């Protein structure tokens, strides 16, 4: 098994970011997103709720002008109440607060607790009317916190006690979140303004919700959003372009790996041309049918030499992609049809070898249990049939 590499300095590159392949990647993503790749950002990885939540709460408590929060799951548990209280206090001291939670992933109890604090909150696409039930499959899956238009927190982390091990609680969900500052925050804020308008009809003043940025970082970044409201499949095209640009390695960590045939073929082609393709999935996810479908789905990748590893418990919810230890992508999307086409998602692509190497190391450290073709073939006929049957439901999982 390949020994995980130590994080390299930003001057050492596995992939040549000046190559024609990366120039094509930059041009393609710029064309499909209609957003520039902006320089001078800072992106810092945060590990689990124990690392991320205190920084997020501190940022809310020191906010001076605006706070915007979007979350798919926002539980009304201990950590959820801490966030509700902090947002309520910010609202009381005159900070403009807007909270967008998903109507399916977050409960009415959470919504009521926000209302009790007089926090402006909306449940995204929440309806019990039969003629609007066709929207039930379209979920707001983004996890974003924006403070004063200056800094943002983004990644896979929901707001829930299972993400924290404070006070001797056991972490049951591992995750990787990110603290972002710099000009790319303007893109993140603009997307929230669009989502808020879509959900409520309220137009937020761009001048109030954005701020000038001090150009102090070295990271080039750009947001990619996906959803049924997009004319082009920004996320799928970005992933395909990144796979095509790879010169040495592709590493993926995702809680759910059920890509469509186009992405599967791209990964297979990458492996056949000598690219190291490494995919890390949980040993057990939080949905057994997803595990069954994944077992039926990854055989063709193993056959062409892709490496598939399992992250041991607790359930690893991180969503990371690294190419050549030079380019990386992180955010809310999973590698499944729901994230590519049905959910409203946000990811950030980053051109920075230091951050990419850090995330590459995280992926290597998480993936410690290799999956083999022999193991898949050893499944009983009944299990194989079950897994194959569930795999047919990929568009709906």
Briefly describe each language-model feature range.
Residues 1-236, 241, 245, 285, ...:
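N-terminal localization/anchoring segments of enzymes in phospholipid and broader phosphate metabolism
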Residues 261-264, 291-293, 323, 341-343:
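Histidine/acidic-residue-rich catalytic or RNA/ligand-binding cores of hydrolases
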Residues 319:
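Catalytic-core elements of nucleic-acid end-processing and repair enzymes
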């Amino acid at each position: 098994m390949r020994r995980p590499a130590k994080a390299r300095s930003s001057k050492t590159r596995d992939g040549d970011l000046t190559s024609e392949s990366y120039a094509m990647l930059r041009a393609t993503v710029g064309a499909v997103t209609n957003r520039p790749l902006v320089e001078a950002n800072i992106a810092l990885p945060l590990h689990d709720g124990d690392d991320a939540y205190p920084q997020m709460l501190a940022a809310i408590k020191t906010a001076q002008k605006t706070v915007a929060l979007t979350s798919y799951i926002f539980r009304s548990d201990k950590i959820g109440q801490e966030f509700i209280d902090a947002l309520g206090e910010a609202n009381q001291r005159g900070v403009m607060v807007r909270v967008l939670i998903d109507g399916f992933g977050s409960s009415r109890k959470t919504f009521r607790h926000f209302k009790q604090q007089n926090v402006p909150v909306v449940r995204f696409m929440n309806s019990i009317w039969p003629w609007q039930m066709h929207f039930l499959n379209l979920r707001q899956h983004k996890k974003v916190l924006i403070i004063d238009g200056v800094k943002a927190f983004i990644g896979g982390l929901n707001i829930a006690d299972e993400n924290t091990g404070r006070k001797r609680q056991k972490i049951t969900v591992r995750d990787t979140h990110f603290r972002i500052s710099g000009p790319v925050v303007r893109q993140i804020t603009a997307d929230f303004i669009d989502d808020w308008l879509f959900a409520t009809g309220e137009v937020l003043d761009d001048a109030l919700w954005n701020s000038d940025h001090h150009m102090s970082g070295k990271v080039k970044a750009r947001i990619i959003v996906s959803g049924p409201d997009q004319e082009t499949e920004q996320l799928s095209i970005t992933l395909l372009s990144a796979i095509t640009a790879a010169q040495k390695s592709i590493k993926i960590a995702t809680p759910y790996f059920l890509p469509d045939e186009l992405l599967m073929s791209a990964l297979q082609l990458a492996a056949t041309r000598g690219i190291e393709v490494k995919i890390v999935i949980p040993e057990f996810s939080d949905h057994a049918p997803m595990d069954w479908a994944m077992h039926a789905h990854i055989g063709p990748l193993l056959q062409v030499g892709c490496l598939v590893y399992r992250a041991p418990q607790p359930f690893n919810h991180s969503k990371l992609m690294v190419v050549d230890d030079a380019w990386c992508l992180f955010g809310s999307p999973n590698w499944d049809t729901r994230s590519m086409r049905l959910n409203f998602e946000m990811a950030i692509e980053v051109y920075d070898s230091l951050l990419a190497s850090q995330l590459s190391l995280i992926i290597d450290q998480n993936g410690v249990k290799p999956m083999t073709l022999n193991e898949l073939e050893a499944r009983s006929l009944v299990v194989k049939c079950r897994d194959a049957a569930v795999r047919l439901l990929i568009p709906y999982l």
